[in-house]
């Protein structure tokens, strides 16, 4: 902390308003902004790439002045959005700088976990579409096993924050949870499959419902989908039957049965 002097005396600060501040140790005037959002600061000597994670240090000050400080691994995420100037990233909290072990951390009142997304929202001029859509979805949809798993969520929660990377301001990001077994409260494999999770990994025949390629349970990918859970066993039969129904069912059968097949 360094002493500083405002160029013009102020009695009340306003978020988003620029203030000129003189810092003697630099013998310079800087522009200072106040924000009502949490502030993230990530520093790393390494180039951040799309895998593997590189070591970095994470520090966040929440609006209640709580501070989270930890070593992390960080990498770029996304597909075509990696070509944009402002990158989305994912971070993994580490117990130390080696990354040999991860640790669960609670951020911004969201879940406690070691994996988090930092959404850049570069293609959203108002930075509201992704967050609002996810909020609306969670308010509208309840999964069919909600009664037995009241904490299960078929979606993610996101919170706004302002991000600095190596002391350079990157703009507003959304800190977000991940859709995974933990979020959905899927049961662990215990000799049989009790819940499945797939990811649409690419635009292919099955993900676009344009074709029905054959599948192999020896592969974790099929028709543009990636099999995410469980790790112990792969069975594409349920998803194959669903895609088959969408593509090949006669209209009258589709309209009679789709409501039972899609929760």
Feature map (PLM): residue ranges:
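Extracellular recognition modules
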Residues: 20-24
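Hydrophobic alpha-helical membrane-insertion signals
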Residues: 33-78
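Internal "kinase-insert"/substrate-recognition segments embedded within catalytic cores
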Residues: 95-100, 104-106, 110-123, 127, ...
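Edge beta-strands of extracellular beta-sandwich domains
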Residues: 26-34
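Residue-level detection of beta-strand-connecting loop/turn positions
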Residues: 25-27, 62-64, 167
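Serine/threonine-rich, repeat-prone extracellular segments and beta-strand-based repeat modules
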Residues: 2-19
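A conserved helix-loop-beta module that forms one wall/lid of the active-site cleft
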Residues: 121, 125-164
């Amino acid at each position: 902390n360094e002493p500083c002097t405002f160029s013009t005396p102020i009695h009340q600060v306003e978020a988003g308003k620029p203030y000129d501040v003189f810092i003697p140790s630099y013998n310079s005037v800087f522009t200072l902004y106040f924000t009502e959002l949490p502030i993230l600061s990530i520093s790393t000597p390494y180039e951040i790439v799309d895998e593997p994670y590189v070591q970095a240090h994470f520090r966040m000050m929440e609006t209640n002045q709580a501070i989270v400080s930890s070593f992390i691994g960080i990498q770029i995420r996304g597909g075509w959005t990696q070509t944009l100037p402002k990158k989305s990233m994912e971070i993994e909290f580490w117990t130390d700088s080696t990354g040999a072990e991860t640790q669960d951390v609670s951020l911004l009142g969201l879940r406690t976990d070691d994996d988090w997304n930092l959404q850049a929202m570069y293609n959203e001029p108002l930075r509201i579409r992704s967050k609002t859509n996810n909020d609306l979805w969670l308010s509208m949809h309840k999964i069919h096993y909600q009664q037995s798993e009241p904490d299960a969520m078929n979606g993610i929660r996101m919170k706004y924050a302002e991000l600095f990377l190596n002391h350079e301001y990157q703009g507003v990001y959304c800190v977000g949870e991940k859709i995974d077994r933990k979020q959905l409260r899927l049961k662990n494999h215990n000799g049989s499959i009790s819940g499945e999770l797939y990811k649409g990994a690419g635009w292919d025949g099955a993900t676009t419902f344009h074709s029905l390629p054959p599948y192999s349970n020896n592969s974790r990918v099929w028709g543009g989908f990636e099999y995410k859970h469980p790790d112990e066993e792969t069975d594409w039969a349920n998803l194959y039957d669903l895609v088959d129904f969408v593509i090949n069912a006669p209209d009258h059968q589709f309209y009679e049965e789709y409501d039972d097949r899609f929760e």
